[in-house]
């Protein structure tokens, strides 16, 4: 093992009430990260969020259990290309819209780079939604329990523990010490693979709902007695998170404590960590987890002492998180495909050639049409308009193609992302970038994971002078194309 088991076994569960008063933290030097570049909390319309998530498309669901979950989280993109995560609550979760808004506003005042911050909310009719920063690199649960390419390294696990402790200290200092159901699914990884704490846990899943949705084996003992979550309950949950990091498994605290008391440490530590840490470091992390899991809430540490304890344990401080995780950095330059290169250069002629060669191959499974019984002369006329549009598109008669494609779309008998993409390019050829952007966004509504829709948005945004947004859209297109090619 990476730590000497004989020395670790000499450790038994020790309470350290004095430790909760340790003072030095790493947060003071981190004030630069209080989210000053983020927009202020705002209220969104349901229409805006519906458009951002392509009509709450199932392809955009990023939460555990998919559509079966009582509260579903979607990824989305606003008109300004900012990527967002949208949590849509069960319709009966928050009947009092005023109470929901007050809670959301309070959480929305928090801004810290250790968190996936809350950007806004929506409370139209029975709809209750939260809007947060989108974190593209999955959850801690994914990287710990369901890893594919490599297990998480010891140095990265320590970094996760520190960052989450710092996030909890920040929230506590801002008067939001209660965090509901802290677990590995609440820890997210940003563009640079740095771990962040989801803001969603700062609000209950409903006005009167439970604070813990996980198995009762992981629930703080006082919550089982009283049904109330306290700041000390959050520390208990942090202890279960440390167990996850130590073991690489979601191990019940009672079982972990039994292993520690029996000095059977080898059964607790993830075998993937062999050779990565010292006996002293392993002992210290187990000691810290045991303190967090004390039965008596008053014997648990507070967030400040967690930060103090975690700072000396940090390893490979100069190594970026994305390197430790084996994930490409957001700043790294991924080679663009020929289409991506053409969009980067705004080479409309090259884009036209690629779309012409592609034809309607990407419409498979995305385009919809009426049933056989609904075939009518009207539909045949509509299809004829599409064919005429295709001929005009092939011969670079772009104004004519716009007219034909528009009549096809207005016919309403079939929905085709490729038609919208082709008309978008025609608008660009005719120096109508706003119309081109609208069509590219509509193509993405129909086919949320289609890279060409993002690429065309990038070209249109560049033509509109929105270079930052264009860069973000180009990056999204490249990521979607890479993901598609891996399938």
UniProtKB/Swiss-Prot annotation:
- Where can this protein be found? Cell membrane
Bilayer topology annotation: Lipid-anchor
Disulfide cysteine pairs (residue numbers): none
Q: Which GO terms describe its biological process?
A: brassinosteroid mediated signaling pathway
What catalytic reaction does the record list?
A: L-seryl-[protein] + ATP = O-phospho-L-seryl-[protein] + ADP + H(+); L-threonyl-[protein] + ATP = O-phospho-L-threonyl-[protein] + ADP + H(+)
Q: Name one GO cellular component term.
A: plasmodesma
SUPFAM superfamilies of this UniProt entry?
Answer: Protein kinase-like (PK-like) (SSF56112), TPR-like (SSF48452)
Record bears the keyword Amino-acid biosynthesis = no
Q: Where is the lipid attached (N-myristoyl glycine)?
A: 2
**What top-tier enzyme class does this entry carry?**
transferase
One molecular function GO term is: protein serine kinase activity
Active site (UniProt): 181 (proton acceptor)
Q: Which Pfam families match?
A: PK_Tyr_Ser-Thr (PF07714)
Keyword flag ATP-binding: yes
EC numbers listed for it are 2.7.11.1
The UniProt record lists the Protein kinase domain at 59-325
Q: Which family is annotated?
A: Belongs to the protein kinase superfamily. Ser/Thr protein kinase family.
Q: What is this protein called?
A: Serine/threonine-protein kinase BSK7
Q: Cite the source lineage.
A: Eukaryota, Viridiplantae, Streptophyta, Embryophyta, Tracheophyta
UniProt gene name: BSK7
């Amino acid at each position: 093992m990476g730590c000497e088991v004989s020395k670790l076994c000499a450790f038994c569960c020790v309470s350290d009430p004095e430790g909760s008063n340790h003072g030095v933290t790493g947060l003071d030097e981190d004030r630069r990260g209080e989210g000053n570049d983020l927009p202020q909390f705002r209220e969104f319309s349901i229409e805006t969020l519906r458009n951002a998530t392509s009509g709450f498309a199932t392809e955009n669901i990023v939460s555990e259990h998919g559509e079966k979950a009582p509260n579903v989280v979607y990824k989305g993109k606003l008109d300004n290309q900012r990527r967002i995560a949208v949590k849509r609550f069960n319709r009966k979760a928050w009947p009092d819209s005023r109470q929901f808004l007050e809670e959301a506003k309070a959480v929305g005042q928090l801004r810290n780079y250790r968190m996936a911050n809350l950007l806004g909310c929506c409370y139209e009719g029975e709809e209750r939604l939260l809007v947060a920063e989108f974190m593209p690199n999955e959850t801690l649960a994914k990287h710990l329990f369901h890893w594919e390419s490599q297990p998480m390294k010891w140095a990265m696990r320590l970094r996760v523990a520190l960052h989450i402790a710092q996030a909890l200290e920040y929230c506590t200092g801002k008067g939001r010490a209660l965090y509901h159901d802290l677990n590995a699914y609440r820890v997210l990884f940003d563009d640079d693979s740095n771990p962040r704490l989801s803001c969603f846990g700062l609000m209950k899943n409903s006005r009167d709902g439970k604070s813990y949705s996980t198995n009762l084996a992981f629930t703080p003992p006082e919550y089982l007695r009283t049904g109330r979550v306290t700041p000390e309950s959050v520390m208990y949950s942090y202890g279960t998170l440390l167990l996850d990091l130590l073991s690489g498994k979601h191990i019940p605290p009672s079982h972990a404590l039994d292993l520690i008391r029996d000095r059977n440490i080898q059964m607790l530590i993830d075998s993937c960590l062999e050779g990565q840490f010292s006996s002293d470091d392993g002992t210290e992390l187990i000691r810290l987890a045991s303190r967090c899991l004390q039965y008596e809430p008053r014997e648990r540490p507070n967030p400040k002492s967690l930060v103090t304890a975690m700072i000396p344990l940090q390893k490979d401080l100069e190594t970026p998180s994305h390197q430790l995780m084996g994930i490409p950095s957001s700043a790294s330059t991924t080679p663009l495909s020929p289409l991506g290169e053409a969009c980067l250069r705004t080479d409309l002629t090259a884009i036209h050639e690629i779309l012409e060669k592609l034809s309607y191959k990407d419409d498979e499974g995305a385009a919809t049409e009426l049933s056989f019984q609904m075939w009518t002369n009207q539909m045949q006329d509509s299809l004829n308009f599409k064919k005429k549009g295709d001929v005009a598109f092939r011969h670079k008669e772009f104004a004519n193609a716009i007219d034909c494609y528009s009549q096809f779309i207005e016919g309403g008998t079939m929905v085709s992302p490729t038609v919208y993409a082709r008309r978008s390019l025609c608008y660009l050829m005719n120096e109508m970038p706003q119309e081109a952007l609208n069509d590219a966004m509509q193509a993405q509504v129909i086919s949320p994971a289609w890279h060409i829709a993002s690429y065309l948005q990038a070209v249109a945004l560049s033509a509109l002078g929105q270079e930052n947004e264009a860069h973000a859209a180009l990056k999204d297109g490249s990521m979607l194309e890479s993901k598609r090619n891996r399938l």
